[in-house]
């Protein structure tokens, strides 16, 4: 039927309206049928049937963004297929959507999902994308076409946040022989995208913040690298046996053995690398961690946990006395709980304020790694028994008394689990041990387990961080963080 309509148009049969379509450059005149335009377009239906003077007029002039594309849309109302001989495909498809929207017609984003748009037209692409309910294909379209120097502040915040989520990746950083390895995670699998930072001496300890990597080597120095460029930005000449950033990266803490009988924890500002405080410890420091509010340092000395003021270096209290040597501790992100693992095979969750035990989990052998989930509801722990467990510790939770075994290490050379880290959103657990593998396990599964062979014999500590695999977004995020902007919440 619509083929006949197009024949009527070409021969000007039964036409009842002379239409002039104008843009900023020229005009096109067409003899058309009111009923066709009104049936296909709410714009024309309102204009030609409403209380406007065009209602009874035989001539109608409209001004559009592009006369050629408007003409093609009207011809398509008659059944002629859309085809483009005048413009680049990207321009035609974007303007086609804008013009259809102007005419009050249904618009569909599927035609632009695979478009390649030049950098000078990115603003137009953003305008068109904002006409739709945003979806993953449109986010991919924006990311794939993003120019290297584009001002991302021009993109609506909700759309920009989705672009950030789309490009956000988790990375694992680990010490290797005379180098630092960085590998990208794709789900629970390790990709082939790897970077290395060469070091003169093999790294002993490694820690990562949102913008820095700190490494201590056997040569007696702490080397600081930019996470953006992977270039060395500072060197601290001190012999360090343990090293860690605070959770927000504001401070770098180093355990320094000043003599055979003297140990201290030095707190450095991560921007200036000036010493903020110095905590003298009378005994050996097994392990330490910080509260996420940067108020306290928790130090495990053999069988007890001491609490120190991070800013002043003053002793606060002793809590968490265990029966045997404490091998690992962690603090929940809400600063309410402390977890410890010891040589007795006990994983204990403590109430930080009262010092009372919230929950105790018993294993058959030593515990060497503990880690709270980001939601502060579960604790992951592992050690010499070749098992990594994830358990609810809240007494009100129905699963609090059930051990959930994430994975049992069947590899014959696995003996210990030394370090545990969660990726963003608690979706994956990454751990290392006394072997040359780093393992990633998807939370909630048993079989989704992947290994990264690092060729290293023992990896005692690893780092996990999130970054963006689009350079424009990555640079913008880091600039905003440096300005302490409140704009971005991702």
UniProtKB/Swiss-Prot annotation:
<keyword id="KW-0677">Repeat</keyword>
<feature type="domain" description="BTB">
    <location>
        <begin position="15"/>
        <end position="91"/>
    </location>
</feature>
<feature type="repeat" description="WD 5">
    <location>
        <begin position="364"/>
        <end position="403"/>
    </location>
</feature>
<dbReference type="InterPro" id="IPR000210">
    <property type="entry name" value="BTB/POZ_dom"/>
</dbReference>
<dbReference type="InterPro" id="IPR051179">
    <property type="entry name" value="WD_repeat_multifunction"/>
</dbReference>
<dbReference type="InterPro" id="IPR019775">
    <property type="entry name" value="WD40_repeat_CS"/>
</dbReference>
<keyword id="KW-0853">WD repeat</keyword>
<dbReference type="InterPro" id="IPR015943">
    <property type="entry name" value="WD40/YVTN_repeat-like_dom_sf"/>
</dbReference>
<feature type="repeat" description="WD 4">
    <location>
        <begin position="321"/>
        <end position="362"/>
    </location>
</feature>
<dbReference type="InterPro" id="IPR001680">
    <property type="entry name" value="WD40_rpt"/>
</dbReference>
<feature type="repeat" description="WD 6">
    <location>
        <begin position="412"/>
        <end position="451"/>
    </location>
</feature>
<feature type="repeat" description="WD 1">
    <location>
        <begin position="196"/>
        <end position="235"/>
    </location>
</feature>
<feature type="repeat" description="WD 3">
    <location>
        <begin position="280"/>
        <end position="318"/>
    </location>
</feature>
<dbReference type="InterPro" id="IPR011333">
    <property type="entry name" value="SKP1/BTB/POZ_sf"/>
</dbReference>
<dbReference type="InterPro" id="IPR036322">
    <property type="entry name" value="WD40_repeat_dom_sf"/>
</dbReference>
<dbReference type="Pfam" id="PF00651">
    <property type="entry name" value="BTB"/>
</dbReference>
<comment type="similarity">
    <text>Belongs to the mimivirus BTB/WD family.</text>
</comment>
<feature type="repeat" description="WD 2">
    <location>
        <begin position="237"/>
        <end position="274"/>
    </location>
</feature>
<dbReference type="Pfam" id="PF00400">
    <property type="entry name" value="WD40"/>
</dbReference>
<protein>
    <recommendedName>
        <fullName>Putative BTB/POZ domain and WD-repeat protein R739</fullName>
    </recommendedName>
</protein>
């Amino acid at each position: 039927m619509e083929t006949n309509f197009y024949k009527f148009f070409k021969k000007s049969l039964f036409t009842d309206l002379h239409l002039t379509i104008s843009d900023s450059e020229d005009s096109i005149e067409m003899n058309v049928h009111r009923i066709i335009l009104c049936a296909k377009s709410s714009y024309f239906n309102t204009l030609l049937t409403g209380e406007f003077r065009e209602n009874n007029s035989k001539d109608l002039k409209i001004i559009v963004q592009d006369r050629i594309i408007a003409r093609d849309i009207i011809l398509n109302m008659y059944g002629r297929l859309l085809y483009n001989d005048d413009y680049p495909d990207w321009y035609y498809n974007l303007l086609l959507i804008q013009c259809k929207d102007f005419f009050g017609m249904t618009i569909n984003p599927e035609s632009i999902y695979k478009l390649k748009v030049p950098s000078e037209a990115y603003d137009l692409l953003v305008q068109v994308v904002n006409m739709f309910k945003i979806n993953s294909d449109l986010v991919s379209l924006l990311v794939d076409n993003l120019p290297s120097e584009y001002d991302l502040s021009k993109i609506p915040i909700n759309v920009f946040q989705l672009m950030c989520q789309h490009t956000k990746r988790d990375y694992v950083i680990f010490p290797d022989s005379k180098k630092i390895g960085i590998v990208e995670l794709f789900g629970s699998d390790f990709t082939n995208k790897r970077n290395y930072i060469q070091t003169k001496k093999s790294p002993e300890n490694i820690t990562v913040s949102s913008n820095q990597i700190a490494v201590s080597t056997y040569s007696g120095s702490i080397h600081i690298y930019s996470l953006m460029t992977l270039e060395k930005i500072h060197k601290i000449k001190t012999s360090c046996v343990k090293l860690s950033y605070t959770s927000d990266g504001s401070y770098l803490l180093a355990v320094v053995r000043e003599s055979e009988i003297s140990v201290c924890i030095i707190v450095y500002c991560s921007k200036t690398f000036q010493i903020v405080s110095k905590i003298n410890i009378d005994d050996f420091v097994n392990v330490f961690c910080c509260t996420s509010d940067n108020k306290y340092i928790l130090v495990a000395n053999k069988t007890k946990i001491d609490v120190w003021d991070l800013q002043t270096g003053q002793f606060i209290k002793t809590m968490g006395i265990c029966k045997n040597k404490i091998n690992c501790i962690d603090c929940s992100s809400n600063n309410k709980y402390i977890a410890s693992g010891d040589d007795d095979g006990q994983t204990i969750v403590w109430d930080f304020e009262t010092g009372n035990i919230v929950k105790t989990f018993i294993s058959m052998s030593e515990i060497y790694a503990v880690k709270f989930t980001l939601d502060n509801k579960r604790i992951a722990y592992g050690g010499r028994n070749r098992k990594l467990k994830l358990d609810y510790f809240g007494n009100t939770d129905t699963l609090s008394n059930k051990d959930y075994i994430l994975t049992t290490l069947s590899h014959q050379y696995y003996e210990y689990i030394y370090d545990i880290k969660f990726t963003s959103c608690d979706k994956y657990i990454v751990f290392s041990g006394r072997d040359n593998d780093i393992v990633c396990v998807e939370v909630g599964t048993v079989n989704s387990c992947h290994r990264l062979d690092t060729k290293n014999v023992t990896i005692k500590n690893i780092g996990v961080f999130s970054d963006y695999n689009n350079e424009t977004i990555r640079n913008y995020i880091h600039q905003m963080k440096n300005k302490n902007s409140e704009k971005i919440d991702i």
